């Protein structure tokens, strides 16, 4: 089974809200992203950083991947953000407003210095980039390949649409080019692609429609601003009974080939190639995450 981490949901948590920081792990997001940037006023930057640092030391967030969105490289806060989060053992640092690979190189250099300073193995802090402008989209391939630490790139639509002199529309046409560029850059680099937040919490139909679109395009997941969106995303990403049964047949064919000592995998007389195997493994991982199969991998009737 391939060991790629599921990242269907990346939930924003305001770094200045003690209750939300403390309780973020109970909602079951694949990734929890503590926000030290837009959600935090200038007067609260230091206290929010300390709050998140302390929480990372004391709160059990279960199996969720822990991400922090630090302040941008054009602010006086980012260096202290990086030091505190590396010291706290954060999994991933997300840099906002990334427009060039050089910005990720600067982030990596500061992370490396912090890892050495605090005795953390060099290379264990991962990075991701938020692309929020036309220049960032144009440079997406270079950004995605900026470092071996990169786990993903994300579209941030509010700043992007402002930069493009437009705004968000219900059909999402204004984001179609950026979504496809970011997705292709991520896939070419072998990392994850994350879609932007959907800000209208009262429009569940619109949220479902947008989530179905980004799932169809191939995004790994979506950034979220409300815990109730988690279940909705998981529902869209859940495989069907037919997909699960087909994946089970592929997995069984793999096991049969192993037992025979054969390097060729076949199913119903047809050769099974690597993309089919990878797709089957991902389907089973999603099926398990959604509790759609039993311990043997068989579909559970609902």
From Swiss-Prot:
Domain of life: Bacteria
Keyword Magnesium set for record: yes
Single GO term (MF): citrate (pro-3S)-lyase activity
GO biological process annotation, one example: oxaloacetate metabolic process
UniProt-annotated location(s): Cytoplasm
Cofactor note: Binds 1 Mg(2+) ion per subunit.
Binding site for substrate: 69, 132
Gene Ontology CC terms: ATP-independent citrate lyase complex; cytoplasm
Cofactors demanded by this protein: Mg(2+)
EC primary class: lyase
Function: Represents a citryl-ACP lyase.
UniProt similarity note: Belongs to the HpcH/HpaI aldolase family. Citrate lyase beta subunit subfamily.
Protein name as catalogued: Citrate lyase subunit beta
Organismal lineage: Bacteria, Bacillati, Bacillota, Bacilli, Lactobacillales
Gene for this chain: citE
């Amino acid at each position: 089974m391939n060991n790629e981490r599921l990242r269907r949901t990346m939930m924003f948590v305001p770094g200045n809200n003690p209750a939300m920081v403390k309780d973020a792990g109970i909602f079951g997001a694949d990734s929890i992203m503590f926000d030290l940037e837009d959600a935090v006023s200038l007067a609260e930057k230091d206290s929010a950083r300390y709050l998140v640092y302390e929480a990372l030391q004391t709160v059990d967030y279960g199996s969720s991947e822990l991400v922090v969105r630090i302040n941008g490289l054009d602010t006086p806060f980012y260096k202290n953000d990086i030091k505190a989060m590396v010291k706290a053992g954060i999994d991933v640092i997300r840099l906002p407003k990334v427009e060039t690979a050089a910005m990720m190189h600067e982030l990596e250099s500061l992370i490396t210095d912090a890892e050495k300073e605090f005795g953390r193995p060099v290379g264990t802090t991962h990075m991701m980039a938020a692309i929020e402008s036309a220049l960032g989209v144009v440079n997406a391939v270079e950004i995605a390949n900026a470092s071996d630490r990169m786990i993903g790139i994300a579209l941030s639509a509010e700043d992007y649409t402002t930069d493009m002199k437009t705004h968000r529309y219900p059909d999402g046409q204004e984001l179609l080019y950026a979504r496809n560029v970011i997705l292709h850059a991520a896939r070419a680099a072998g990392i994850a692609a994350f879609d932007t937040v959907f800000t209208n919490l009262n429009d569940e139909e619109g949220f479902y429609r947008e989530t179905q679109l980004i799932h169809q395009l191939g995004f790994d997941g979506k950034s979220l601003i409300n815990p109730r969106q988690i279940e909705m995303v998981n529902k869209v990403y859940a495989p069907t009974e037919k997909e699960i049964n087909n994946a089970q047949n592929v997995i069984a064919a793999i096991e049969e080939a192993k037992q025979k000592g054969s390097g060729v995998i076949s199913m119903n007389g047809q050769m099974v190639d690597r993309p089919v195997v990878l797709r089957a493994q991902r389907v089973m991982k999603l099926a398990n995450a959604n509790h759609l199969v039993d311990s043997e991998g068989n579909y559970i009737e609902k």
